[in-house]
């Protein structure tokens, strides 16, 4: 691997992995403060992988979020009673 590519990879590992929001699934949390979204990882070893994650704060389709890791996925939202 070239010096430049290796340096870029180290920066991505330190800061996080950028991912694009491709679908908003719904709200979760006691007060609805967390939004469950599907994201596509843009960089790193899992590039192109689609994950379900919980995001705190306002988010729209097409937004870029930074994931600290790409291993975990959020559980699916349950149906309300």
UniProtKB/Swiss-Prot annotation:
GO biological process: maturation of SSU-rRNA; ribosomal small subunit assembly; translation
Record keywords, A-Z: Ribonucleoprotein, Ribosomal protein
Classification via Pfam families: Ribosomal_S28e
Domain of life where this protein originates: Archaea
Gene Ontology terms: cellular component: cytosolic small ribosomal subunit
GO MF assignments: structural constituent of ribosome
Keyword ATP-binding: no
Cited HAMAP family: Ribosomal_eS28 (MF_00292)
PANTHER family linked: 40S RIBOSOMAL PROTEIN S28 (PTHR10769), SMALL RIBOSOMAL SUBUNIT PROTEIN ES28 (PTHR10769:SF3)
Protein family according to the UniProt entry: Belongs to the eukaryotic ribosomal protein eS28 family.
Protein name per its UniProtKB record: Small ribosomal subunit protein eS28
Organism: Hyperthermus butylicus (strain DSM 5456 / JCM 9403 / PLM1-5)
Name of the gene this protein is made from: rps28e
């Amino acid at each position: 691997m070239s010096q430049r590519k290796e340096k870029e990879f180290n920066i991505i590992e330190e800061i996080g992995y950028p991912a694009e929001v491709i679908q908003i699934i719904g709200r979760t949390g006691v007060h609805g403060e967390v939004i469950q979204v599907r994201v596509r990882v843009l960089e790193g070893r899992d590039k192109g992988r689609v994950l379900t994650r919980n995001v705190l704060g306002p988010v729209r389709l097409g937004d870029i979020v930074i994931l600290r890791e790409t291993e975990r996925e959020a559980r699916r939202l349950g149906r309300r009673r």
